[in-house]
Amino acid sequence: MADRERGVCCVPVRRLREGKVAQLSEVLKALADPTRLEMVTILKDATEPVCVCDFVATFGLSQPTVSHHMARLREAGLVESEKRGIWAFCRLRRDLPAVTRRLIEALG
C-alpha cells in the first residue's frame, strides 16, 4: 500500500519528548505576557541580580504585581531570587536548559 493511501504523504516528523513539551509549554506561557517578557530581557542583560523595587519603578507597577510576575517566572523555572532585607533580588537561573537559554538569548 502506498504511503499516500495510508494517510502519510510527507516526510515522517520527529516529536519532542513529553517532558520537554510540558517544560517548554510552561516557559512559553510565562513569556507570553509582555511585562514578563520584558522582565526576562532585563534580567538577561543584567550583570547582577535585579531588585524587585527596580521593576516597580521601571514598569510603574505595584510591588505585589511585580512579585506576582516574578512568581510566575519562578514557577516556569526561569528565575531565582534571594531576599535581602525587605526586597527580593532576582536573576535568571544559571542552570537553564540549553533550549530555554537559546530562546532567551534570541530575545535581543
Residue ranges and their predicted role:
Residues 59, 70, 100:
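Short amphipathic alpha-helical/adjacent loop interface patches that line ligand
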Residues 101-108:
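Short, charged, intrinsically disordered terminal tails
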Residues 18, 22-62, 84, 88-95:
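N-terminal helix-turn-helix DNA-binding core of bacterial DNA-binding proteins
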Residues 67-71, 86:
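Base-recognition residues in the alpha-helical recognition helix of bacterial helix-turn-helix
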Residues 57, 74-75:
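Alpha-helical residues within the helix-turn-helix
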Residues 95-101:
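Short, charged/polar, Gly/Pro-enriched secondary-structure boundary elements
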Residues 1-31, 76-78, 104:
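N-terminal leader segment of winged-helix/HTH proteins
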